[in-house]
């Protein structure tokens, strides 16, 4: 399945974007995908293929410093510029469609964290139809030592563009060996994370868990209980405290990329059923 690719202009940066058109008559619904750390929106073609066959328009984009977007690998201008990419993305979707539609944002991993911050802090989030959040890094499977956490803000202020390996193991993404091999061979993936981005990811996760958050739209939160990258306990803690219509669905035995597991169609079907029930 081939996407129509285009560019978004965001605070002086050109962000790469994708549009997979519905392959059956439109159902009036749109999914906007927000990808994770080190990867890019083009990796979600399987999600797009499934939902476009159901009449959804599907869009995705590459974050700054990721994929085919501008910005040094793994770096951000600021956390505010990172979160506000969603507003730019939404405006591009609105500009591409000339008929009324219902917009669902789907965020995975780092993209899930950014989406949770957006949902809990932006008034414009209230105009969404729903959100799907998968495997957010609210708690890490291999958290940094406490001494590094305490120094993170200092290092980020002194050397915000300095990058290090994100230490992600491709074998922890999926049980599907082909997914792992494709991830490792993909020239648009990278393993870099800047001091500024890393600090803000840790800080945002702590902030979102420190007190109950209010989510203004229905939200489906999915997480594999065998995720070794982002510990499911963070999703459980968030869901137990959140104010709003939030459903946590745990997937027994699944790794980090629930949408890329051998049982991915079960994940898609569950999300479809949940979205259908919102009507």
Set out the residue ranges of the language-model regions:
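Short beta-strand/loop motif that positions the catalytic acidic residue
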Residues: 215, 221-223, 227
């Amino acid at each position: 399945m081939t996407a129509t690719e285009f560019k978004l202009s965001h605070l002086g940066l050109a962000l790469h974007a994708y549009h997979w058109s519905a392959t059956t008559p439109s159902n009036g619904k749109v999914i906007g995908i927000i990808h994770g750390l080190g990867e890019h929106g083009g990796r979600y073609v399987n999600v797009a293929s499934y939902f476009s066959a159901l009449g959804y328009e599907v869009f995705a984009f590459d974050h700054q410093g990721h994929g085919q977007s501008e910005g040094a690998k793994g770096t951000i201008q600021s956390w505010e510029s990172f979160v506000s990419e969603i507003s730019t993305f939404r405006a591009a979707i609105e500009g591409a469609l000339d008929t009324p539609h219902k917009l669902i944002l789907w965020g995975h991993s780092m993209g899930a964290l950014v989406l949770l911050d957006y949902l809990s802090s932006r008034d414009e989030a209230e105009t969404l139809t729903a959100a799907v959040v998968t495997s957010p890094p609210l708690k890490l499977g291999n958290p940094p030592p406490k001494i590094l956490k305490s120094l993170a803000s200092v290092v980020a202020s002194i050397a915000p563009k300095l990058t290090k390996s994100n230490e992600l193991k491709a074998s922890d993404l999926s049980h599907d060996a082909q997914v792992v091999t494709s991830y490792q061979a993909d020239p648009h993936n990278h393993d870099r994370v800047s001091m500024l981005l890393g600090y803000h990811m840790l800080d945002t996760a702590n902030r979102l868990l420190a007190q109950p958050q209010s989510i203004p739209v229905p939200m489906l939160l999915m997480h594999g209980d065998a995720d070794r990258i982002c510990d499911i306990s963070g999703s459980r803690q968030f869901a137990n405290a959140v104010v709003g219509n939030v459903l946590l669905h745990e997937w027994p035995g699944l790794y980090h990329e629930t949408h890329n597991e051998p049982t991915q169609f079960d994940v898609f079907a569950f999300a479809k059923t949940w979205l259908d029930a919102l009507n």
